[in-house]
């Protein structure tokens, strides 16, 4: 039992940071975080967050220690040291350099000693500081440093908890002076410490509990159980080597003054954080003025002010306006009566401007959306999809207070506009497409679309009967009833009872997969699979659309109001939610019957306009392939022509199977379909599928050249872009892992095609909307390549002609754009 420790009053506290270990840990923990330029920065961000957390409580003196580039004495003593670790990731060295720059800008001491690892430097610093009367904390998750623990030296884990000698005893039943002995006995795969084969953690702890130390244990080998003794004797060299490698050095002659840390270089630190788009860290490092400190001013605000508002829920057609404020030039104006104050605004300028515009339209007010920082951020990088994320990235915090949101909008707009200076194509997209489109979408959301509720109720009953019939058929084929919605029960029936081959396993649990992809592959293996797929489709559509749609009808308008998301996809396409109209199947019978429920107002008709093969036409324009261009210019069927070239037969000899193969390849090329996937789609041998793809590129040689050029530019610039300059960053084009790199390549050459098609649709909507208003018609829905309008019966034909003309002439391409038009009382009949 130790005697009572004398009272200790430390001179101060020293914080030692295991820089290399912390950087590597955060690099893997936050994978995927990049700047809007596609620059990976996850290690820098994670390191800064962990360091900030530690700096708030610790460290009169702070020293950050990194591994030196040269090999350490351990590598020289044992060539296999740390050989079990994966090679350094390609993005890591550059981020490590940025981390060191951050440390310097923060005014923190930085140290690396050639020939020694950070562990030895940290250990020597800790012991030196302890000897000089300091309390020491080491920020690390490296267990090697547990051997340093004492009453004055503690380890601060990056997750925030403190590791002390008492913690070590409670967790492992070991003292700090036993830790290197324990590691020597058990070994460590990551450091390639061999240890003693056959001695695990439990046995090692028991031996140290009995003998106190490795030294005492080795002096009493003859008193050990024979099995343990034999293992140790057989691996004595490994044991001694492991101890030498596990024991950290505490005697490095380091000349360090544990003085108080220097002040950070605030201006350069701010510029550094802004360059890496660490907006939230500007606040945390105290480099931003708080919006709460802004001057209060009376309502109404001056013209051009940015608005901030708070809704009771995210859907503006259903929400209450809880608070409204505006900010301009450092002053915040809070509206005493939010609804009444809407009349004082000429435009909704600020984050989520479209939502406020929709709410105003609901209230009978014309409040067009103006500048929205969200749209600027989205054009800079399409991964910017939420106000929370944009605020965090570019300097601020998205709070629940309207005044703070208004001030944030003003600050973000200035920041983002500055970043877009000189980016003329992106600015053109903002001014001519995205900003005016937000006003169009606001009107579409506020207008909504009628639903045939009686029809949906009847359809629900009909589908319920069909589901019950399919369920009974599945039970008959299985030989007994079971819960069809239980994946575990379905797994047993398919693979254990019916003996179907298990194709794949789930990622999380490793169980045999019953996913849609697996069932599709097993479709021909047993009749039950087809029935299960049909059951799943019907239950999904019933629960997602048929049953919920009537409940989404607004009581005030009697119409369904879907939300159009302008900043949600990586390609620039619009998406919708509440409900998601994109997921209604186009080609299945039930999907088509659901579309039948979307109907025109009494005395009106729906006009459906669909761009025909727009992505293939865009591909023809972007690639400049003469054969592809000629087909569209001459108005011939692209799939028949492709089949004719691929199979070497006249057009007249192309049969349905040939055309289907050509169609699959035509669209498959856009998404980087592999020969393996094509062989599955067409049920043909792999070699034949490979030959098909090769013949396709021989038929359209400039398509392959364009793909290669796009990938080359993507690697060089870090991004790919549409015809109009919309960007998508693809840093993984340089990834070492083949599957990751190939996925990035597919993404890279698909985005310019899909994104250009999206840009054309958006531009057409912007041009068409005012013309429709002049004719008393409405724009209702935009789904995939389709636009749905509503027009008075007597003007429906004229509206259809106008819309077709605008959409086909939206922008001159090397090939004509073609729009298929239909008119009907419901969405389905308008498509037929």
UniProtKB/Swiss-Prot annotation:
SMART domains tied to this protein: 53EXOc, HhH1, HhH2, POLAc
EC number in record: 2.7.7.7
Membrane-crossing segments per the record: none
Coiled-coil ranges per UniProt: none
Protein's UniProt keywords contain Hydrolase: yes
Sequence ranges assigned to domain 5'-3' exonuclease in this UniProt record: 175-260
Primary role: In addition to polymerase activity, this DNA polymerase exhibits 5'-3' exonuclease activity. Unlikely to have 3'-5' exonuclease activity due to absence of a 3'-5' exonuclease domain.
Protein name from the UniProt record: DNA polymerase I, thermostable
Organism: Thermus aquaticus
Gene expressing this chain: polA
